[in-house]
Regions:
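Collagen/collagen-like triple-helix recognition
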Residues: 21-71, 179, 692
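Proline-centered linker/hinge motifs at extracellular inter-domain junctions
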Residues: 61-63, 67, 72-79, 110, ...
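Surface-exposed, proline-enriched loop/turn segments that connect beta strands in immunoglobulin-like
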Residues: 65, 81-85, 119, 191-196, ...
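Short, solvent-exposed loop/linker segments at the N-terminal edge
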Residues: 71-73, 86-92, 193-201
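Extracellular acidic, Ser/Thr/Pro-rich low-complexity tracts
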Residues: 99-106, 118, 173, 208-211, ...
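Solvent-exposed loop segments of extracellular immunoglobulin-like
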Residues: 106-113, 210-216
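Surface-exposed, flexible coil segments in extracellular/virion-facing regions
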Residues: 113-154, 218-241
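Short sequence/structural segments immediately N-terminal
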Residues: 164, 169, 176-180, 186-588, ...
């Protein structure tokens, strides 16, 4: 017990800061002391039931989860261009001044960049400044591609030639904000080249070129009362002036002594009134009714369907038809002049271009803006010039076609320039540009179609070598008449008729748009003058059917000189096949030693000729975004559209050329053998030779061959036809002296030659015997080679194959069989 007590006594208690000592045994318990301080909080009790939801709190701030942008800060500069739309002239300096403002930056810190977006390539000065300068191309440069096709008269200008230069000005501020503006500069509004012109539009003339190198023009405006017109460029080939009032203007070029009369007027528009104003006379009684067929062409509906939201078929949806299209789709739409054109009436009418192309737009124009609707569509005036009814102006539309200097040529032109004034515009209107590189555009054969060069025989050449002649001839063919071009009553064409058609130097045109396409009639596809089939062709082929559009090509691309084969009477002359023999080749027709018809598989091509030569673009045209081909040439791309790409066309052509060479050699050898046999038999050989460079003969008449040959030739080679007659080149054993007969264009000269070119009819014999055909006649000049001899027939066949130009591609099996059969006949 003691130890326990000691242990208890050993306990020290600290109270505050005092130390108590040890105490004795505890006394009895005292009364309870006062309550002590509260102890620390206990652990939390269990959760109570959830309380009611409180009111919604404020929205949380939005969080941008997109990537961080590096776009410029601020607004783009506002940009304008002084002279943004202007007509500057050809070879003229142009200045475009840009002005920019920027709400965020000092304008001195803006940067400028001019970009040419369309038009002829121009040399730009100041392209990195606010002010751009350049010079438009000259008129001569613009017309270079077609210069050889032009002649004295009015000068047409297409939209492409007018030089539609477009520019974009980009202005950038220091923060990278970009502002833009555009400008458009033309050298001149497009013109048709007609002598009937609108008031207020600058017109250009063209003087003779070639040997003429100086010009002296003058303008007489006395028949245009009140005119203050000024002629510019009077000493150049291309003078111009703006006809400023209604009336007649006469231009004279003193060096060539040629004159030109131009009639100026304002536009009239007759879309809604032609039935009453025009068809009173144009009713097929007083004058031809061209209006009824014209009303069914795409020209007549060039606006109405498009405003209503479809293409010309009235079905296919059209999504774009901007106001700028009205320049070609209406009458006289040109801001360059005030002459009652579509734009002039539009300004006063209150009409505005619809913002949406939809049904009812055209009807709205007709109902509420009839004066404007009168000028809508492509009408008579688009292609024939203004018809405002001014004294002396309306009358230019009416003239006799028999007039040798018809006034109608002020309003009628077959020039492609009339069509190109709309249809030659950048990438979507390119057909004239294609045509300009074609053989149809060349004028080297056009002179053969004029009365001045051919007299009445222009009826032969003019039917296919001139636009006017073919337009008349195609009507004959459509009626089943394949004879020479003649008057409507069937009598032979005379000077008055040929000049009235336009087959004279001042008006004749090459094979232009209007030669093949009838602007007044859509009866045939593509408004072609012929379609589908023909009763006859001048090569003797009859009943052509299912040729499609290609039948138009066949009208001229045939041998033309009647049928020559073993199924008709023997030939009585040496006429060769006319040069374009493509139709004969396609049908396998007109060859001696062969069945009468040997048709090509290519006749199954849709539209025959046109299926390959028009419908499919070449590789070059396709690369330019063009969908057809009015150059009419072909390439491997076109062939590959049907044939395997592995087909080696060049190897094929080389093989065919070799066969032609073999045939030519065989013909020459056979002819030489005949001439040698004649000499051996004691005959004398006489030749009338020809000089192609100057178109001269060694004697004045074909019946008087003049060169007596001392010996037979050492070689004979078939050459190209001389004036349509089968011809040879003779190599002589000894040179001879040739005196060329003078002509109107070449003097008489003498030269020594060892080779002579001559028509086969110009090789004659005189002596003891004659060839088997014709019968022997002692002493009389006779053809050394008969018209129905194997040499004459073989020569025809070779020319038929060669003149086709395709080297057998049009009809390979026919080509090869003709060669084989002709070689067999020559043995």
């Amino acid at each position: 017990m003691k130890n326990n007590r000691v242990s208890r006594l050993a306990i020290c208690v600290v109270l505050g800061s005092s130390l108590t000592g040890c105490t004795g045994d505890a006394g009895p318990a005292g009364p309870a002391g006062p309550a002590g301080d509260a102890g620390p909080a206990g652990p939390p009790g269990p959760s109570g039931p959830p309380g009611e939801a409180g009111p919604p709190g404020p929205p949380a701030p939005a969080i941008d989860a997109s990537p961080v942008s590096d776009a410029p800060i601020g607004k783009s500069p506002a940009v304008t261009i002084a002279g943004a739309t202007q007509t500057a002239g050809f070879g003229a300096p142009v200045t475009l001044v840009g002005t920019a403002s920027d709400p965020d930056s000092d304008v001195s810190k803006l940067t400028y960049k001019w970009i040419q977006t369309a038009g002829p390539t121009a040399t730009l000065t100041g392209a990195a400044t606010a002010s751009l300068t350049f010079t438009t191309q000259t008129l001569a440069a613009a017309k270079t591609p077609v210069m050889a096709q032009l002649h004295f008269g009015m000068l047409p200008i297409s939209p492409d030639e007018a030089g539609n230069y477009t520019f974009e000005l980009d202005v950038t501020d220091p923060e990278g904000n970009l502002g833009k503006a555009t400008a458009s500069v033309r050298s001149n509004p497009p013109t048709t080249g007609l002598q009937d012109v609108p008031v207020g539009i600058r017109q250009f003339m063209m003087g003779d070129g070639g040997a003429q190198t100086t010009w002296n023009w003058s303008l007489d405006a006395t028949a245009a009362p009140g005119s203050a017109a000024i002629l510019t460029g009077a000493s150049t080939q291309f003078p111009s002036f703006i006809p400023d009032v209604v009336g007649s203007y006469t231009l004279t070029e003193a060096v060539s002594t040629k004159t030109l009369t131009m009639v100026a007027g304002n536009w009239r528009g007759e879309m809604m009134t032609y039935q009453t104003e025009c068809q009173t006379c144009h009713n097929d009684k007083i004058a031809p009714d061209v209006f009824t067929p014209w009303s069914k062409t795409n020209h007549a509906i060039a606006v109405q369907h498009k405003l209503n939201g479809t293409y010309s078929d009235g079905v296919t949806p059209l999504t774009s038809f901007p106001r700028s299209c009205m320049e070609c789709h209406t009458v006289g739409d040109s801001p360059a002049a005030v002459n009652h054109g579509f734009d002039d009436v539009e300004k006063t009418s209150g009409w505005t271009m619809p913002t949406k192309l939809q049904p009812g737009n055209w009807e709205n124009m007709v109902t509420n803006y009839p004066a404007l609707a009168d000028l809508a569509g492509i009408q008579c005036e688009n292609c024939h010039g203004p018809q405002d009814g001014a004294i002396g102006h309306l009358s230019t539309a009416h003239t006799s076609s028999g007039n040798t200097t018809p006034a109608k040529w002020t309003r009628v032109s077959f020039s492609e320039g009339v069509c190109a004034s709309c249809h030659q515009d950048a990438t979507h209107h390119y057909k004239p540009s294609q045509w300009q590189t074609s053989a149809h555009a060349q004028r080297d054969l056009v002179s053969n179609a004029t009365f001045e060069s051919r007299g009445t025989t222009a009826a032969h050449c003019g039917r296919c070598h001139s636009a006017q002649g073919f337009a008349a001839y195609s009507a004959q063919l459509a009626a089943g008449d394949a004879t020479l071009l003649h008057k409507p009553d069937g009598t032979p064409a005379d000077e008055a008729y040929l000049r009235g058609l336009g087959l004279q130097t001042s008006t004749v045109e090459a094979i232009t748009c209007a030669a093949c396409h009838d602007p007044h009639d859509a009866s045939n596809p593509s408004q072609l003058r012929l379609g589908g089939g023909l009763k006859a062709l001048p090569n003797g082929l009859t009943n052509i059917v299912d040729a499609g559009k290609g039948v138009l090509c066949m009208a001229c691309h045939n041998t033309r000189n009647a049928e020559h084969d073993d199924f008709v009477a023997a030939a009585t002359d040496f006429s060769g096949p006319h040069t374009p023999s493509q139709t004969d080749m396609l049908y396998g027709f007109n060859a001696y030693f062969m069945p009468r018809l040997n048709p090509s598989k290519h006749l199954s091509v849709t539209d025959t000729c046109a299926g390959c030569h028009v419908a499919i673009p070449t590789a070059t045209e396709k690369a330019a975004g063009q969908s057809d081909n009015h150059n009419f040439q072909t390439d491997d791309t076109i062939c590959a559209s049907c044939h395997s790409a592995s087909t080696d066309g060049e190897a094929f052509l080389a093989a065919m050329n070799a066969q032609l060479g073999d045939l030519g050699t065989a013909i020459g050898s056979k002819a030489l053998a005949i001439l040698n046999a004649l000499y051996t038999a004691g005959n004398t050989l006489t030749v009338r030779t020809y000089r192609q460079a100057t178109d001269q003969y060694s004697s004045a008449a074909a019946t008087t061959p003049d060169l007596l040959l001392a010996a037979a030739p050492t070689a004979v080679v078939l050459r190209s036809a001389i004036h349509g007659t089968t011809s040879f080149t003779l190599t002589l054993a000894a040179p001879v002296s040739v005196a060329w007969t003078a002509t109107a264009s070449a003097p008489a000269v003498t030269e020594t030659l060892s080779q002579l070119d001559c028509q086969i009819s110009g090789i004659t014999i005189t002596g003891q015997t004659a060839p088997p055909v014709p019968p022997a006649t002692t002493g009389a000049p006779l053809p050394a080679i008969a018209t129905n001899s194997v040499v004459a027939k073989a020569s025809w066949n070779l020319q038929l194959l060669s003149n086709d130009g395709s080297r057998g591609l049009h009809n390979p099996s026919f080509f090869q069989n003709v060669v084989v059969k002709t070689l067999e006949a020559l043995q």
